[in-house]
């Protein structure tokens, strides 16, 4: 428990861009897997999504929007992750992030 009342660092837009990149860019997940852990994500839904992505990557499974939705549904975590629409929306966050750079 955080007893000094400081707010944890958070950047949901960056989290969304990272997750979106992992969904649509094959090179992104190996980089993320080397440096990120699910608990590093501030948003609970992002932790759930990244945990599934990481497990799929480590198992050698194909990662894309459809397979991640299926994996989350199989785990009973799809709604906690933001639902099918939320997962699909992550891919658009990558393009929007690039526009703002």
Positions of predicted regions on the chain:
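Noncatalytic partner-interaction/assembly domains of nucleic-acid and motor enzyme complexes
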Residues: 1-98
């Amino acid at each position: 428990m955080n007893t000094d009342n400081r707010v944890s660092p958070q950047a949901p837009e960056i989290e969304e861009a990272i997750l979106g990149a992992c969904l649509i860019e094959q090179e992104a997940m190996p980089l993320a897997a080397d440096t990120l852990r699910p608990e590093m994500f501030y948003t609970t839904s992002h932790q759930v999504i990244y945990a599934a992505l990481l497990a799929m990557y480590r198992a050698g499974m194909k990662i894309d929007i459809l397979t991640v939705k299926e994996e989350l549904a199989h785990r009973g975590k799809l709604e906690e992750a933001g639902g099918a629409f939320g997962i699909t929306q992550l891919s658009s966050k990558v393009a929007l992030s690039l526009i703002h750079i």
